[in-house]
From Swiss-Prot:
Represses a number of genes involved in the response to DNA damage (SOS response), including recA and lexA. In the presence of single-stranded DNA, RecA interacts with LexA causing an autocatalytic cleavage which disrupts the DNA-binding part of LexA, leading to derepression of the SOS regulon and eventually DNA repair. Belongs to the peptidase S24 family. It comes from Haemophilus ducreyi (strain 35000HP / ATCC 700724). Homodimer. This is LexA repressor. NCBIfam families: lexA (TIGR00498). GO terms for molecular function: DNA binding; serine-type endopeptidase activity. Pfam families: LexA_DNA_bind, Peptidase_S24.
């Protein structure tokens, strides 16, 4: 597919989008784009995003948290493909997330919605991550991995329980931070308590977009 060339500023924003997704697992907000690029207003970021969408480099999604989808990879190749991802409901204590009894159904998505790729969708229970737009009933797209960087939103298993939180490693301790001012972080000493990273969040599908 032939695409129009980007201006220097559009290329800068496009590169930031890809870098932010690679490092955090999610697209940036308009405010984050404006702060990074030096715009005075998020509206300026919005206009450049619309230009990127018109030129075929991204798609702006409704019903999706941080609704930006990259349409080409670093080699300027199309990455769109249809997938059917398992939808995971409530995870029983001490059992693998992908156990067959947890799969409620399969949900069709376009593979380009998520970078890195999503391996499954996890139904969100509660509002512990509401400040970053992950709400009760949403579907959290998860990339399976045991490695995560500080600041990424992870699916973590602490003892027998699975939780979605923002990761911070500090010294010997691991902090799992909620994005809700009414809740406290989970603090884990891996020497005393079992903890494993089971995946990183790579996107969100709003509950009213699939229910």
């Amino acid at each position: 597919m032939s695409r129009k060339h980007l201006t220097a500023r559009q290329q800068e924003i496009f590169d930031f989008l890809k870098h932010h997704i690679d490092t955090t697992g999610m697209p940036p907000t308009r405010v984050e784009i404006a702060r990074e690029i030096g715009f005075k207003s998020p509206n300026a970021a919005e206009e450049h995003l619309k230009a990127l969408a018109r030129k075929g480099y991204i798609e702006m999604l409704s019903g999706t948290s941080r609704g930006i989808r990259i349409l080409i990879n670093n080699d300027n190749e199309d990455v769109t493909q249809d997938l059917s991802l398992p939808l995971i409901g409530k995870v029983a204590a001490g059992t693998p997330i992908m156990a067959i009894e947890h799969v409620e159904s399969h949900y069709p998505v376009n593979g380009a919605m998520f970078n890195p790729n999503a391996d499954y969708l996890l139904k969100v229970n509660g509002n512990s991550m509401e400040k970053i737009g992950i709400l009760d009933g949403d579907l959290l797209a998860v990339h399976k991995t045991n490695f995560a960087r500080n600041g990424q939103v992870v699916v973590a298993r602490v003892e027998d329980e699975v939780t979605v939180k923002r990761l911070e490693k500090k010294g010997e301790l691991i902090y799992l931070h909620p994005e809700n001012d009414e809740l406290q972080p989970i603090i884990v000493d891996p020497r005393l308590k079992y903890i494993e990273i089971e995946g990183i969040a790579v996107g969100v599908i709003r509950n009213n977009a699939w229910m």
